[in-house]
């Protein structure tokens, strides 16, 4: 059962750079990395739809399709991590939880109906799959600094991102962290004296420390019969099971959930791109 770590932060907060440095610090093959699937969102389906660009150009119209696709991508990644039982630490660029809790809420053009749909889908997937993060590393970055980085890297799909949106996103991240039941380690990354390598080392040591704490706690729970970390012998093939408990019950299988999210994805690809 992997230990899921989510690297969170605003747009251009340095998540990708941090993950790159963490790769170099990883001591062995037990660290597995899952970057955000941005390229997938820019080439969806046979028509190669750039859903990310469409969202930034018209966030009111395409926020729900994008956030739905983001959730689908994250479920697929976390299923892959779950099935890699030898992996002790899985590092994800952003958590599943932030899709509905941050980005859906941060869009001022999101209608109440769209927010409800995003939240309902999020709740369904949380209940029926293993998408929970064990720890969140949050890169706290000033919105103005993020805007400067966005301007510098000059990605076509980000050219309409403005300071107001980034400030709104920043505020929703703060609220998300305040509400979160998941342990959060906040790292300030605006200090020009600190290198990416120094920030990565801080994150690396935090992850190792929290993993040790989690492992000690989990061992006690196993001994007390509270949960079973992997699939018991009487269950079906482990690569089709999301979670098994000692009494033999199980959540919805990965196979069934995959079919559900594929149906949702097919609906996304029918989006009006005119």
Positions of the model-derived regions?
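Hydrophobic anchor at the beta1->P-loop junction of P-loop NTPases
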Residues: 7
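P-loop (Walker A) phosphate-binding loop of NTP-binding proteins
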Residues: 10
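Conserved lysine of the Walker
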Residues: 15
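Hydrophobic positions on the alpha1 helix immediately C-terminal to the Walker A/P-loop
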Residues: 18
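Conserved substrate/cofactor phosphate-moiety recognition/catalytic segment
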Residues: 24-67, 72, 101
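Glycine-rich phosphate-binding loop used to anchor ATP phosphates in small-molecule kinases
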Residues: 62-130
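A glycine- and Lys/Arg-enriched "phosphate-lid" helix/loop adjacent to the NTP-binding pocket
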Residues: 100-171
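NTP-dependent small-molecule kinase module
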Residues: 147-274
């Amino acid at each position: 059962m992997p230990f899921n770590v989510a690297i969170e932060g605003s747009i251009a907060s340095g998540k990708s750079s941090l993950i790159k440095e963490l790769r170099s610090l990883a001591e062995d093959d037990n660290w597995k990395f899952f970057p955000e699937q941005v390229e997938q969102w820019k080439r969806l389906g046979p028509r190669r739809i750039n859903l990310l660009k469409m969202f930034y150009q018209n966030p009111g119209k395409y926020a729900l399709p994008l956030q739905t696709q983001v959730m689908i991508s994250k479920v697929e990644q976390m299923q892959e991590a779950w099935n890699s039982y030898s992996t002790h630490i899985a590092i994800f660029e952003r958590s599943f939880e932030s899709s509905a809790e941050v980005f859906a809420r941060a869009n001022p053009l999101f209608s109440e109906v769209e927010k409800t749909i995003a939240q309902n889908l999020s709740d369904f997937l949380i209940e029926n799959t293993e998408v929970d993060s064990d720890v969140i590393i949050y890169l706290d970055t000033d919105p103005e600094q993020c805007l400067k980085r966005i301007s510098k890297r000059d990605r076509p799909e980000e050219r309409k991102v403005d300071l107001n949106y980034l400030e709104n996103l920043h505020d929703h991240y703060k609220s998300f962290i305040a509400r979160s039941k998941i342990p959060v380690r906040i790292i300030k990354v605006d200090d020009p004296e600190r290198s990416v390598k120094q920030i990565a080392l801080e994150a690396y040591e935090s992850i190792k420390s929290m993993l040790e704490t989690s492992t000690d706690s989990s061992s006690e729970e196993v001994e007390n019969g509270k949960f079973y970390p992997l699939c018991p012998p009487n269950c079906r093939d482990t690569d089709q099971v999301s979670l098994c408990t000692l009494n033999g019950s199980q959540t919805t299988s990965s196979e069934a959930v995959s079919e559900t999210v594929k149906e949702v994805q097919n609906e996304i690809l029918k989006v009006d791109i005119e």
